[in-house]
Amino acid sequence: MLDRRSLLLGSLLLASSFAYADAAESGGMVTPMPTPDGGIQPQAAVDARGVVHLIYYKGDPKAGDLFYARMAPGESRFSAPLPVNSQPGSAIAMGTIRGGQIAIGADDRVHVAWNGSDKAEPKGPGGNPMLTTHLNAAGTAFEPQRNLITWAGGLDGGGTLAANHTGDVYVVWHANPDRDGEENRAVYLAHSADNGRTFGRERRINSVPTGVCGCCALRAFVDRAGDLFVFYRAATAKISRDMYLLASSDRGATFRSEKVHPWNINACPMSSSSLTQTDTAVQAAWETQEQVYFADFRPDGGRRTGPIAAPSGGSGARKHPVVVANGKGQTLLAWTEGTGWSRGGALAWQVYGPDGKAVTALRGRQPGVPVWGLLTAFAHPDGGFTLLY
């Protein structure tokens, strides 16, 4: 069996395969790219210096590994990958919505959180752990993974994390310690005030008893003003699977709750969502009834514009939306089509102008999303977008 050092040394040989063309050089505003190294479920974040940080998944969908690579401004290649999880096989890709999440904290420290697989250690109360780690100060390796669940166990759908430049790191998951149905699930937060070195005990943050869709993922985000947002799908009475946005202006001490979009369905859609920063607002993207939408929100969580639906056309149910804005006020909305349990599909996208209207010429679709695949995207200084699948 290869140890972690062998994996790292071997990964150096793969660096030459991580080439990426600049969006402006690719002949189009949106450049679709497969995840490097044959990985799936890419997740990207861009730091204050313009460095793109990427994590992705490889291995057995039930018990695999996360890897990390970065690309500096002006470069066209991602670095050789580093292993993220310290215990091999402790991540999970099956179901699509339980994989790794990435955030950039103080001093551009990279933080990662993920739902632990059945093999993952240390275990938490109620089973699978909610795991986290961060890149060391030298940027050469990740610290040993830690479980943050101390009492709110019963993990199911994907957890998430967010961070800011002042040292706050927020890891969020939904759980049901009493195991009495998803209509009684709640959202829990573990907060670090020292850039991920230590975390406080988790506490419930949604005061409205909405329940939480058991096998749906959460998404957290900190805007440039330091406000914290958490986007989740409810499961009220097992039927009302509406999207809710929680917003906090006091570093997660208190939250306001805003119902964003209704959806009555007596089933779990296994959905994910997206949050991003624009020049003037926070944008959210989500799925409702096999369609994807996005909207702008104020710091208090109230909606400013939208929801705006993706244009008609395509083939298959639309899922797993991603939204990202560039410096010109344009928005890229991307999503998968035809994906499902143990089934890949296509990726599709639409660029919207600063007025919120779809630019017909900046629309696309192509096959290639692998089984258990997700999308991620980032904007370039020239306004172009790279869309990873």
Regions found by a protein language model. Give the residues of each.
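Hydrophobic h-region of N-terminal signal peptides that target proteins for export
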Residues: 12-21
